[in-house]
Each structure stands twice: as structure tokens, then as C-alpha cells.
Amino acid sequence: MFFLAVAVAAVLFSIFPLTDTDIWWHLACAREWVQTWTPSRSPVVNVHEYFQRVVGFVYGIGGAPLLVAFKAVLWGIVFALFLLPQRKTCTESQSKSATLAGVTLAALIFFIFRYHFEIRPVLVSLLFLGIYWNLLPKILNSSRFSTRTSSLEPRTFFMLISVLVIQWLWCKCQGLYILGPLFAVAVLASAWLDAWRLKIKLPKRLRLFHVGVVLALLAMPFLHSEGLNLFLYPFGLLDRLVGMTPSAAVFASEIAENRSPFTLLMAGENALECVVMIALCAAGLVFAAWTAFKGRCGLIHICLFATAVLALIAERNFVLFLPVFLCGARGSRFEARGLTRLVVRSLSPVEGPNHVSRLLIGDNSTKVLKHLVSYISSLVSSFPSLVSRLSSLVLIGFLLGLWARSLLAYDSSMVAFQRVPVGAAAWMTIHPHEGHLFNDDRAGGYLAFVNPDDSIYIDGRFILKTADFFERYLRYADEPALFMHDADSLHIGRAIFPLRYYARWGNLVSVLVPHEDWEVVYRDSLYIVLNHSFRNLVSER
């Protein structure tokens, strides 16, 4: 029951407050599309609409605690779906000897990267990919055609319709819906490669069916009202990933989650996570390349290679790699017990009639020696297993202890008040201001959700902003004079800045606080709110 144990571990380590600040603008958009008072690109495609409706519905029932429980269950389902096809690939003896070690490895990885298990649209994408992981290889299998007719079997036809419906829903959950057709291409590449190795010529109708499935998946965006704009959306994501256009280059270089783990490691950010991430991705790349070199490249190895490359390009893609990595690790594990048994058997003096022991001692002594060696062999062969199991249990207990301790430190509201301005936003709702509001991108979504009447400057939807706008926004942190000039020209009457967990704005805050045109109206240990008096602007007029 390896997949079930890993799923439970994923559920447990996914229980923590809503640390991803983007969830708040998703919740705000679920209520009403959020418009910033600053200019945005057009056309606007709300590719997250269905995801926003779901999280908004869950939040409306039970608030942040229920949303945390909901996403924890979904993460468990994701890993269960990816590991489900392998539940019968191992013998019972192999499972007993390797399951505990495998679960320990998974638990250790989950603990290190637990804060990646957030409630984001990528979670829905992984859920749909997990379903595809189980269904698409069966749908595209030639044996699923009826032997008497050229039609699909009813079960296969039902699975195909289910996949197409999921793809249609996926198009309005996240721009990564393109992973569905790409995974279908990977399945076809693996199947056609196997057929080529075995010198099997696939029937023409089967090849046409394969191509038709991929084209049908690609056509799903056109069944929505946004049509072409929705179809082109993934190209914008690719642009942001590699930084081909100026605005995407700014995003790729300035947003931490979109930077490579190598870049983050050299900057000294999340050093432990980055080192482990790079090591795991490198292991995945080496394993995939080695199997390809040996001529045994399959679907897992294709996906492992692709997701490892994506994770090394941008840290946020690591969650795409992790389920595939666990599948690959599960299918290629090595057992120390097998080597121990081989050594013991080679040393055992009870095999063969011409063995040296039979020449040196009699038959009765041989029987006694046989039982003695058998007993010693069982002890020797079981010793590594006992040590391994004991070590695994100790490590799992240690991780669970740290996890339980972390639960005590969380606020019962399950809102990460260190990352969003909980106290400041509550104060601002009852203390209105004149002019526009300036906020940083991480606080924008929460402010829009808590106080929708006060239009925000920016939120996490960077794809809606131009390169010039984003570059000028980032310059404010290092050029206080530029910010104060724009505050006058743009009629900014209030500004809110983080004080601790996002240190970009420290220099600007230190200049604004003593300035005569700015007044501190709210301050706590995490956020500061300042009002702008416009005195200089009035005197000039």
C-alpha cells in the first residue's frame, strides 16, 4: 500500500496556513473580477475562472480552515493517482522490504518541500494530469479496439469522453491545460517507440485515432467563448518562463518563484531547498538519460526528463516534477537484502554434492551444519532489514514530531498574517482615504478581497501588466524620489508596505516616514500604512 501511505503523508504535510498570496486575488475574482486602477493589457482572459469558482465556494462554506483541508486532501489524491498504476508492478516480498523505506524517503521530501503544497491552480492541473496518467495509456492502447469492428470498446469510449470533458474544464482552470495534449504526445511517443523497437507496424486506423485524440484535446479551448485567446494563452506562459519578451524578462528575473533554483542558490535564498531540488532533478535527468542509453526509455522516463528540465528552469515547476520522480524512484528501487541473500547463498556449505564441506565432514555433521548455517543466514539476511526499518521508523517519528510542533505555531484562522496585511487591511476598511491606493504585489490580492471598494495598484496577475509599468514599479523601491513624484502625478493618497518578510521596500519606507508630506497612520510589526497629504501639489497650483 505504498501509494496510500504516500498519499496520507502528502495530506498531513499539506496542512499549513494559506501562505500563497495569489489565492486571495483568486478568491476576490470569484466574487467579482478585480480591476486595478492602473492600466492593464487587453484582451483579458480569465483562464482561472473555474478554479476561482471552486475555491470561492469552499471558502464561502468554511473559510480558510476548510480551504486548507480541501487542498490537503487534493494533494493526497494527486500523489495517489500518480502512484496508482504501479501498485501491482512489484511482488509482495519486494513491497514488504521496500515500502517503509520508500515512504520514509517520500515523507522526508514532503517535509522539506511542504510549503510548495499550496492551494494554487497548478494543483488542479496536477489532479487532471493524475487522471490522464491512469486513463490515456489505456485509451491509446491498440488492444482497446474491438477485434470484430473498427469501433472503440464501450469502456474505452467512456474514458475518452471523460478525458475530453476534463480537458474542456481544464482550459478554464489554468493555462497549463496545454500539459494535457503534451502528455498525450508523450504517451504516443512511448507507444510508437516500443512498436518500432519490436518491429511492429501499427494499423493505419490506430495511428489516425492517436492523432485524432491529440487534435481533439488541442481543440477544447475553441469550445469556450474566449476561443482563440484561450488557445494562445499558454504561449504567454512560455514567454514568462523563458523571458523572450521584455515584460516576460522582467518577470522571470525579478519574481522569486519564477527563477531557477541555481539563481536562488547563488543569491542565498532557500539554500537547503535549492540544493535538494537540484540534486533530485539531476538524479531524475541521469536516470532518464541512462534508461534511454540502455534502450529502455518509457513514458515515465520521458516525463521525468521533461519535468526535471522545467523544475531547473523555474522553482515553481518543482511540483510538476515531484510526483513523476516518486513514480520513477518506486519503479527502480534497489534492495540491500537481495545482495545480502546472494552473498549468504554463495557462502552456504549445503549446496551441491561435491561441496568442500562434504569432503571434510560426514553426512550427519553436514545436516547439523546445514541447520546452523541456515539459522545464521536468516539472522544475517534480516539484520540489514531490521536496521533499515528501525531507522525509517525513527526518522518518520522525528518528522511527525516536527510536523505536530509546527501545527501549534499556526494561527487558528489559517491565514498567514506574516504574508498578507491582516491587521492593516481591517484598519483600512474603516478608515477611508482620498486619492488612489499604492500597494505591493503580494498584498494586492488580500486587499482586494477584504476591501473591494478601495481599488488596488497591482496584484499577482503580472501577465496583465506591461514591461514599462513593471520596471517602473520595481524602481520605486530603490528610487524614493521617483515614487514621490509619481505619487503626486497619479494622485496616490495612501500607501501600504510590508516591514519584515519582503524587505524590498525598506529603503523607500525609511525615506517616507520622516517626510512632511507623508504621515504614518497605522503600524504593526509586519505592515505600515502612510497617508499622503498633497500639500506640495496644492501649493504649486
Label each region the model flagged.
Residues 470-527:
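Periplasmic/luminal catalytic loop of GT-C fold multi-pass membrane glycosyltransferases
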Residues 138-168, 207-212, 298-304:
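Short hydrophobic alpha-helices at membrane interfaces in multi-pass membrane enzymes
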Residues 81, 112, 124-144, 185-188, ...:
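Specific aromatic-rich, kink-prone transmembrane helix
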Residues 39-40, 45-57, 228, 232-273:
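Juxtamembrane membrane-water interface segments that cap and precede transmembrane helices
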Residues 389-430, 442-444, 462, 474, ...:
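Membrane-proximal, lumen/periplasm-facing interface regions of secretory-pathway glyco-
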Residues 10, 109-113, 158-175, 184, ...:
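Membrane-interface alpha helices of multi-pass inner-membrane proteins
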